[in-house]
Amino acid sequence: CSLMVPCPWRLHAVSLLQETPELSFGVHLTSVSEQPLYRWGPVTCADKVPSLVDEQGYFYSEERIDESLAKLELSELEREYRAQIDWVFATGLRPTHLD
C-alpha cells in the first residue's frame, strides 16, 4: 500500500490509514503528474521548486519528462521529497517504507 501525498484525495487516504493502523504503507515519492487531465503539483510551494513544475504550476506530465529532466535541480527534488515525507509524519502516521 502506498500514499501519494501530492494527489487530491490524500486526506481521505490518510483517514483510511488512520482507521487501520495495522496496515503497513509507504510514501510513494511523486514528482510526475501522470494523467493529462487529472494533474497535481508539489507539496512545496511551486516557486520553491521551479524546476519540477510546468508553466501552470503542476508537475510535468509523462509526455514532457525529457523537458523536466533537462531542467531538474536535484536540490529542489530533495526539498519536495522531504516535504512529502514530512507531511505524512505530521498526520501522525508512520510509514514503513518509501517507494
Residue ranges and their predicted role:
Residues 4-8, 28-34:
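Active-site beta-loop-alpha junctions enriched in small/polar residues
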Residues 10-24, 42-54, 90:
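Acidic (Asp/Glu)-rich catalytic clusters
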Residues 75-97:
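CE4/NodB-like, metal-dependent polysaccharide N-deacetylase domain
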